[in-house]
Amino acid sequence: MSILVKNNIHWVGQRDWEVRDFHGTEYKTLRGSSYNSYLIREEKNVLIDTVDHKFSREFVQNLRSEIDLADIDYIIINHAEEDHAGALTELMAQIPDTPIYCTANAIDSINGHHHHPEWNFKVVKTGDTLDIGDGKQLIFVETPMLHWPDSMMTYMTGDAVLFSNDAFGQHYCDEHLFNDEVDQTELFEQCQRYYANILTPFSRLVTPKITEILGFNLPVDMIATSHGVVWRDNPTQIVELYLKWAADYQEDRITIFYDTMSNNTRMMADAIAQGINEVDPNVAVKIFNVARSDKNEILTNVFRSKGVLVGTSTMNNVMMPKIAGLVEEMTGLRFRNKRASAFGSHGWSGGAVDRLSTRLQDAGFEMSLSLKAKWRPDLDALELCRQHGRDIARQWALAPLPETTQKTAPVEETTTCTAADLGPKMQCSVCQWIYDPALGEPLQDVAPGTPWSDVPDNFLCPECSLGKDVFDVLATEAK
């Protein structure tokens, strides 16, 4: 089924509600995606891009119901990746002599995927035009490394539509095609997620390329992307966001993520977050366990943040594998204008935190001091973590923070109070996780100093997600 975009332009793409992994398993498409292909019917009939290769047969069948394939005069391939040009082999088997307009780099990419050097390729470069009749032209603009060397955009005069390729798109599937028809919160979340995880490495190219396109002084009434919605309502809003995101973007936000074997590094993360909030209650702090979180959400939060704290247990003298993998991805994304600090617990020998700190520095982060704790952090160690958080809050503040005269209560007083007033520690009978009233459970809004009797009935064990009824008094404290 086609959808009218504007005048003689129709969407003939494919929705993919089920896809959950993109670029292998590197991008989680939690809201599906779409592969946008456009059919222009003027004096000349033009097809802009195809769809993902797994929908090749369906795409050609649907296209045949819209137009006699032999009547397609030109094919435009803005990008040779398989989710854009994947149906070319199926299509060209029907119309093998139809000219394909693309960049020189795209010929190499297309042949690399489809192995048909005999196809009728027509190389275009920035400023080249193609007359499609009725007083209208297609103008081509090369956009190398946004995000492949072969990438380009195509502008249609008369209708003032920019076919923008991957730029300004999002992996977002909806029955509606246009930006003003969908949930705006979801849409802009997916736009930022897409930019943070795919286009961030090329931020230095975004601003000059947008400036170059604006320099053509061409009106833009619509931006027709390769994935997600078509921008018809105030289409320049997404262009303005790209310019903002490309300019060393950061919010007053700190992201903390960690992996842990025995919950010790998690305790450190909670305490560090408490310290940050004590000194700067206005900064947004998000905590993620990488083993249980969507990594693309973590990376999007890193993109938004002024700084990141990364925690790892030590395993065989090195960091946890999921942490190592995520730091490697951050290295490839080449975040700019970000600060970082490493922390973690260890047993008889360390090594992971130092290695992690070096990796973060190699990834381009401005480093602050790291923090280590041996074994399970006691009250003294947790106070050091909170102090580390306070120090980080001051060092990373975007504006000077007021001095505080509040003094931290001596550890001995806290210990006495805990033993006398807060009741016993509780242990999950399933996974052995221990609830310490002195520490609380900040991720579930249970403040430090909360006795078990005051913990809400909807409390869930953070390790196994079972309720309060599976908890018993810790054996060493039972009377």
Swiss-Prot record:
GO terms for molecular function: electron transfer activity; FMN binding; iron ion binding; nitric oxide reductase activity. Fe cation 1 binds at H79, E81, H147, D166. Residues 254-393 form the Flavodoxin-like domain. Keywords: Cytoplasm, Electron transport, Flavoprotein, FMN, Iron, Metal-binding, Oxidoreductase, Transport. Binds 3 Fe cations per monomer. It is found in: Cytoplasm. Fe cation 2 binds at D83, D166, H227. FMN binds at residues 260-264, 342-369. Its cofactor is Fe cation; FMN. One of its GO terms (cellular component) is cytoplasm. InterPro entries: Anaer_NO_rdtase_flvorubredoxin, Flavodoxin/NO_synth, Flavoprotein-like_sf, Metallo-B-lactamas, ODP_dom, RibonucZ/Hydroxyglut_hydro, Rubredoxin-like_dom, Rubredoxin-O_OxRdtase. CDD domains: flavodiiron_proteins_MBL-fold, rubredoxin. PROSITE patterns: FLAVODOXIN_LIKE, RUBREDOXIN_LIKE. Residues 423-474 form the Rubredoxin-like domain. Pfam families: Flavodoxin_1 (PF00258), ODP (PF19583), Rubredoxin (PF00301). Pathway: Nitrogen metabolism; nitric oxide reduction. Fe cation 3 binds at C428, C431, C461, C464. It comes from the Bacteria. Residues 30-210 are annotated as: Zinc metallo-hydrolase. In the N-terminal section; belongs to the zinc metallo-hydrolase group 3 family. Homotetramer. Anaerobic nitric oxide reductase; uses NADH to detoxify nitric oxide (NO), protecting several 4Fe-4S NO-sensitive enzymes. Has at least 2 reductase partners, only one of which (NorW, flavorubredoxin reductase) has been identified. NO probably binds to the di-iron center; electrons enter from the NorW at rubredoxin and are transferred sequentially to the FMN center and the di-iron center. Also able to function as an aerobic oxygen reductase. This is Anaerobic nitric oxide reductase flavorubredoxin.
